[in-house]
Amino acid sequence: MDIAQLVDMLSHMAHQAGQAINDKMNGNDLLNPESMIKAQFALQQYSTFINYESSLIKMIKDMLSGIIAKI
C-alpha cells in the first residue's frame, strides 16, 4: 500500500470538490433554491473529503507512533 499515492489521490479529489464549489458559487444565481441545494451539496462533498483525508492521516500517524513506541 503506497500511502503517498493514497494521500495524493484524496488531495486531488478534495481539490476537484473545491473547484466544484467555486463553479457553483460563481456560475449560478444563488437566490434560486435549486442552485443553493447544488452549492450546499458541493460544500458537503468538500467537507467530507477533507475530514476523510484528515482521519486517514491521523490513523497512519497513530499506527506509526504505536509501532515506534513498541520498538
Curated annotation (Swiss-Prot):
It is found in: Secreted; Cell surface. Keywords: Protein transport, Secreted, Transport, Virulence. GO terms for biological process: protein secretion by the type III secretion system. Signal peptide: none annotated. Induction: Expressed when residing in the host ileal loop, host macrophages, and when in an acidic environment. Repressed by methyl-3,4-dephostatin. GO terms for cellular component: cell surface; extracellular region; type III protein secretion system complex. SUPFAM superfamilies: MxiH-like (SSF140129). NCBIfam families: III_needle (TIGR02105). The core secretion machinery of the T3SS is composed of approximately 20 different proteins, including cytoplasmic components, a base, an export apparatus and a needle. This subunit polymerizes and forms the helical needle filament. Belongs to the SctF family. Component of the type III secretion system (T3SS), also called injectisome, which is used to inject bacterial effector proteins into eukaryotic host cells. SsaG/SctF2 forms the external needle filament that protrudes from the bacterial surface. During infection, can induce innate immune responses. The needle proteins interact with host TLR2 or TLR4, and induce signaling by NF-kappa-B and/or AP-1. This activation is MyD88 dependent and results in increased expression of cytokines, including TNF-alpha, IL-6 and IL-8. This is SPI-2 type 3 secretion system needle filament protein. The gene is sctF2.
